[in-house]
Amino acid sequence: MLLDKLEFIENKYDELSVKISDPSIMQNQNEWRKLCKEHADLEVIVNSYREYKKVVEDLKANKEMLSGESDKEMREMLNEEITDLTNREEQLETEIQILLLPKDPNDDKNVFVEIRGGAGGEEAALFAYNLFRMYTRYAETQRWGVEIMSLNETDLGGFKEVVFMIKGNGAYSKLKYESGVHRVQRVPDTESSGRIHTSTATVAVLPEVDDVEIEVADKDVRIDVFRASGNGGQCVNTTDSAVRITHLPTGLVVSCQDEKSQLKNKEKAMKVLKSRLYEQAERERAQGIAEDRKSQVGTGDRSERIRTYNYPQGRITDHRIGLTLYKLDTFLGGDIDEMINALITADQAEKMKLMGNTQM
């Protein structure tokens, strides 16, 4: 029963409240921080559950009062309160069910975002740049940091490929739904006849992983160094500071040339490689677990066409949830929270459905 689980969580929360106030436990800072985090994680659920119990109690009391009340005005007032309390009870039930969903262990992590121009040549590269700008501006609104890992520009200012890191609490929880193929429909600046072209760009969002989560043996990698290049391939560095790492067992290749130091580029490239290997392992694991129950909201299939950006109509359509927004300019300017929140809600609804009957 869900109520039994909530009672267990509340008791656990009370135990932790006592422990984190214990001076003997506070002396062990690592243990104390761990308990504080566990306490904070449970606090939201416990607060909602305690409010739920109070609402149920008040609802019962008002119904009892109503059954013995003959005064018309008092009955009207009690009926209003019962309606409000019933609505709040339903809201809290949904809220608690969502809070009890299994938490993605990567949700609080920083992310690596990889954007590559796909079908459409130069126009696809320009669209890749548009997406990069959209995500970096969104990161600014969230007060997240952005750090470019590698960049391959075209002569017209588009991006053949860009890999960058977004640092901030909850970055993966919001951006993980962006992985997939993004399609743009617009008239290119170079198109004299005014025909609408369709181009694509691929986005991959990878959680940053700790060294302890993924180990890469020296024998499994080949490291090449070369000179960094800028627009159109011209050399921008006189030393071999750029680094390319090839993971021999999988064939994955990562390049980094953003730093002037070869050592720093190697460290950055290795971070990206570990995140790619982690994502690959997680994807294979998830496919094994959910082979026959594909989730409505994908968070990892790079070949899945997830969204269309239609310039003539000023619209964005997410094909996974069928949501269309008519605010293309502000969306590409970083105003993407409405879409992200809709994807999170759809994902939560799908998970609740898979959990089966969770009535309180």
From Swiss-Prot:
What does the record list as coiled-coil region(s)? none
Which residues does the annotated region (Disordered) include? 285-305
Q: Which organism is it from?
A: Clostridium beijerinckii (strain ATCC 51743 / NCIMB 8052)
Output the superkingdom of the source species.
Bacteria
- Which SMART domains does the record match to this protein? PCRF
Which Gene Ontology molecular-function terms are recorded? translation release factor activity, codon specific
Q: Which GO terms describe its cellular component?
A: cytoplasm
Q: Which InterPro entries match?
A: PCRF, Pep_chain_release_fac_I, Pep_chain_release_fac_I_sf, Prokaryotic/Mito_RF, RF-1
What protein name applies here? Peptide chain release factor 1
Primary location: cytoplasm
PTM description: Methylated by PrmC. Methylation increases the termination efficiency of RF1.
Q: Which UniProt keywords apply?
A: Cytoplasm, Methylation, Protein biosynthesis
Compartmental location:
Cytoplasm
**Role summary:** Peptide chain release factor 1 directs the termination of translation in response to the peptide chain termination codons UAG and UAA.
Modified residues annotated as N5-methylglutamine in this record: 234
Q: Which family does it belong to?
A: Belongs to the prokaryotic/mitochondrial release factor family.
